[in-house]
């Protein structure tokens, strides 16, 4: 009780003196005191205080809103679902799977095979209830979470960081990338250079969206939410077919032939996550269509990367969906 009182006083300060917070992050690790005692936390009290003082803040990891992806290596699932069975917000379960000591081998561990599937129909069929629990992938730009001069030559490469970004931010997960300050209280020059290279690459890649000027059609819609709506990168407008139409095709006729390397898909997640399988096709000069990418889940964002293809038209084929698919955005780059 004394610890919880002290903690809530500090939490009150943090939630009232620093403006609006987008997240309150509780680590899964629970360290022992010098006497071997592990603190027992009054989680419900903490959550209630945050909801009162910062109602828009997402409570992450050991909390009810944002789920830890299950590793610190930057590994991700091929099919990342945000709709899960209830029970994944148990802080004790999160703590049991978290790092128990400063362990380099733990930070290299990938998602276990038994936790690759958390949200498929098979996994959900006997669930007592369901919850919206999007994933956060947390990893470090260096081998560990803190700065060590001896690791200045072990900063992750730009290529590795971009791969992690595409698999997380482009794979229906969020990304927490740890950048530890050095003994000067600054980010080390090598780390900064990697981040600049990463940012420059992403800005260049996504500078021009060919879908903005494309003619967009769908083989069906519900009469109220046309395919044209996927130009807008927001949740105010979206494309939707009639209920029960779980397989649809959207066609994008570009203004002129372009070299295309990326396609971005976003579901209208205010109406949940629905898509289970999709394919991206490019039109060849002879008029035939060739599949250039195929995937499973989409969620808030899925980014497909592929070898450059020159084309003047692309098709997004939703092959299967739990209920009729609802897309808020499609980008072609």
Protein language model regions, located:
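Mature catalytic domains of secreted/periplasmic carbohydrate-active enzymes
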Residues: 1-246, 251-252, 259, 264-267, ...
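A generic beta-sheet turn/junction motif
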Residues: 256-258, 284, 309, 320
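Beta-strand signatures of extracellular beta-sandwich domains
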Residues: 279-281, 331
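Exposed beta-strand face motif in extracellular beta-rich ectodomains
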Residues: 312-314
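Edge beta-strands of jelly-roll/beta-sandwich modules across compartments, strongly enriched
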Residues: 322-333
């Amino acid at each position: 009780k004394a610890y919880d009182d002290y903690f809530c006083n500090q939490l009150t300060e943090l939630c009232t003196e620093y403006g609006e917070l987008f997240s309150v992050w509780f680590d899964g690790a629970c360290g022992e005191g010098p006497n071997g005692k592990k603190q027992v936390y009054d989680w419900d009290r903490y959550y209630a205080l945050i909801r009162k003082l910062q109602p828009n803040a997402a409570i992450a990891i050991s909390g009810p809103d944002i789920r830890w992806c299950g590793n610190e290596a930057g590994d991700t699932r091929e099919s990342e679902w945000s709709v899960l069975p209830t029970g994944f917000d148990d802080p004790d379960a999160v703590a049991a799977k978290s790092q128990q000591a400063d362990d380099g081998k733990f930070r290299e561990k990938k998602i276990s095979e038994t936790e690759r599937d958390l949200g498929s129909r098979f996994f959900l069929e006997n669930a007592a209830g369901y919850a919206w629990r999007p994933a956060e992938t947390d990893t470090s730009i260096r081998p560990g979470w803190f700065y060590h001069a001896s690791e200045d030559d072990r900063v992750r490469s730009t290529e590795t960081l971009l791969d992690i970004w595409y698999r997380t931010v482009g794979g229906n997960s969020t990304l927490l990338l740890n950048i530890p300050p050095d003994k000067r209280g600054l980010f080390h020059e090598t780390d900064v250079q990697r981040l600049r290279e990463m940012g420059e690459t992403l800005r260049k890649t996504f500078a021009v969206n060919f879908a903005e000027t494309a003619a967009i059609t769908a083989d069906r819609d519900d009469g109220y939410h046309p395919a044209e709506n996927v130009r807008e990168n927001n949740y105010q407008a979206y494309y939707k077919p009639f209920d029960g139409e779980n397989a649809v095709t959207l066609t994008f006729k570009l203004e002129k032939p372009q070299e295309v390397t990326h396609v971005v898909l976003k579901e209208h997640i205010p109406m949940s996550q629905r898509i289970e399988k999709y394919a991206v096709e490019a039109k060849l000069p002879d008029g035939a269509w060739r599949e250039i990418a195929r995937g499973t889940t989409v969620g808030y964002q899925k980014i497909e990367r592929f070898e450059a293809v020159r084309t003047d038209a692309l098709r997004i084929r939703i092959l299967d969906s739990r209920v009729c698919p609802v897309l808020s955005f499609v980008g072609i780059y």
